[in-house]
Amino acid sequence: MRRNPRPGSAASSHNHTPNFYSENSNSSHSATSGDSNGRRSAGPELGEPDGRMARGSSCGEPALSSGVPGGDTWAGSSRPKLAPRSHNGQTACGAATVRGGASEPSGSPAVLEEQLNLLPILDLRQEMPPPPVSKSFLSLFFQVLSVFLSLVADGLVCVYREICSIRFLFTAVSLLSIFLAALWWGLLYLIPPLENEPKEMLTLSQYHHRVHSQGQQLQQLQAELSKLHKEVTSVRAAHSERVAKLVFQRLNEDFVRKPDYALSSVGASIDLEKTSSDYEDRNTAYFWNRLSFWNYARPPSVILEPDVFPGNCWAFEGEQGQVVIRLPGHVQLSDITLQHPPPTVAHTGGASSAPRDFAVFGLQADDDETEVFLGKFIFEVQKSEIQTFHLQNDPPSAFPKVKIQILSNWGHPRFTCLYRVRAHGVRISESAEDNAMGVTGGPH
């Protein structure tokens, strides 16, 4: 809205006024720049001298820098920048002019007229509305809307992916179920049904009852099997014992075919004073050996008995020992026989306790002061269980006693066992009648 000059003004309109406003509007449009706060800056007017540029600051307007006259942009040159001015009120010079020209004339009347013509422009600047903010609000709204739509799109993508994964899982489970069902039906058709399979369906109680009854039957069968196993074991043991008795009975027969003077049934005995002590198992410490009425260890006289079953032997400690046998009379000794069970029959699985190296001595008198060496021999446990050794009794001599000295065994570290010892020869009678009859002894 433009204002005309007041009637009392010293300046009057003339033909130059339209051109001034047209040029002023063009220059102001080109020189005015708007900022975000709605303020504008006006450039220098057309035809304004250089002194006006310098005096602009005195009237509240920004001073113009020196340049092209008129302050307009010509031939593409840039217009000088102006300092910002306040749009909230009039300048001091303009206010003084409106109130009746109280201010002093700053120059020529043409300058005053130009200042008065600038008042409508100043009024228009004061009445200009604030810049619209609809553009910034719409841009903010669209930004929020775009962010919201992007979040919604991301959520929809996640939901779609979950749906796809669930669909894939459902498809896999379905295919697996179909495969298992086909496999089950194939097994049912391929495997023939059992002949004894019950056709009717059993209840849970009936099933438990049958399982319990079958369990009892199994327990009974196990008890019977254990009983049969014990019986078979006992039968085998009895059979083995009977076979062993038969074998040793055959062995105990007069296999040597020579008289035995070291037999307890014909009067032979053991001289305990000159015989090694019995073996006592100190590791196990047999309880029955401590009782006087029961002695588990066999005495030395067992070697004078024909019973040579495994375990029925005389054992002495270590691998060296001796035994002295009283003969039933004076006997011209010719042979000595040792008997030991074979390793296959021994309970320990071997014959390491059998004697190996031994020597035989003949005792001349009852005081046993004189010993006659009759030979040294080796008992080969792997050859035969009965082995006879010829004595070196030449010329033949009669002895009332015979000593068997064991020098070593077959490797047992704790004891040595003697099962049976036989003494062969000719018994010499001490009476004169026998001497007259010319009884001579010799080996048989």
From Swiss-Prot:
It comes from Rattus norvegicus. This is Sperm-associated antigen 4 protein. Keywords: Cell projection, Cilium, Coiled coil, Cytoplasm, Cytoskeleton, Differentiation, Flagellum, Membrane, Nucleus, Spermatogenesis, Transmembrane, Transmembrane helix. Disulfide bonds: none annotated. Residues 19-36 have a biased composition (Low complexity). Residues 267-428 form the SUN domain. The chain crosses the membrane at residues 137-159, 166-188. The gene is Spag4. One of its GO terms (biological process) is spermatogenesis. Pfam families: Sad1_UNC (PF07738). It is found in: Membrane; Cytoplasm, Cytoskeleton; Cytoplasm, Cytoskeleton, Flagellum axoneme; Nucleus envelope. GO terms for cellular component: cytoplasm; meiotic nuclear membrane microtubule tethering complex; microtubule; motile cilium; nuclear envelope; nuclear inner membrane.
